[in-house]
């Protein structure tokens, strides 16, 4: 089974490397020539625990390669994963331009060939409900036949930055969205080595799969905003939020994960995905009230932290030197996207502070 990964960002690089580690022949495609050359040397473009070792080993053993040539991937692979950026647009909706362009480029290549064979196109990116349908329509518009020339699958990632390699190698579950039994069987085959410990491969329709990813991230973000609200109230009433957190976290119905109060969530996923799910609800005329609260609380946490620091020095930080430990949005990663620390630092600088930051 030959696998191609279109996009070598965080998700694409981890996905491709881990499939290669399990013995598959993997070709990763990216338009950035410098990035491709760096990866071909075995030098990762992101920091992720255990990734560099696997990258070097699989390149050396000939299972993993990198290229800028999409045609090489299109005609040399059975399964093609689209692991492309879906950044938020001005209205909060996910920008699907990269995904749609890749789908169109692949369709053009296959449509121009007399015998391109059958391919499974997999949306690995976090995408709104209906994206699989959109990709399918793009390919059908090139006169490709669904079920004969191609099938489209939704296969969201559930990787935690910092432990993404471990998450991919031993997933708690694999979600596969497709109405094609042929495509579903291929997906079972490539994921079977990862679930030998008995964790499930859940096959469902594409829209349910796409919703699963957004619902999961939005629920985790909700837990963070909830415990931050509890922490704020604890300060008012004289309670210890750490004790409260432990008290509720030992309830098996709740669990203790994501119940750590702080200055709010950040990163490339939670803020974007909560906004995108809210935007989806708006498009369908549904008022998803709790998501507004989650985002509002999260914004308030970082504002509140900066305000407290400034007010504790009488409203001015002129001449003050402040150390900031931690710039990434979470531990064990170098990802600073949407990091709450950056907002706090900017506010402290505006108040006249000198910042000494460490990570």
Question: Where do the protein language model's features map onto the residues?
Answer:
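Structural/interface elements that position substrates and couple domains in central-metabolism enzymes
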Residues: 1-359
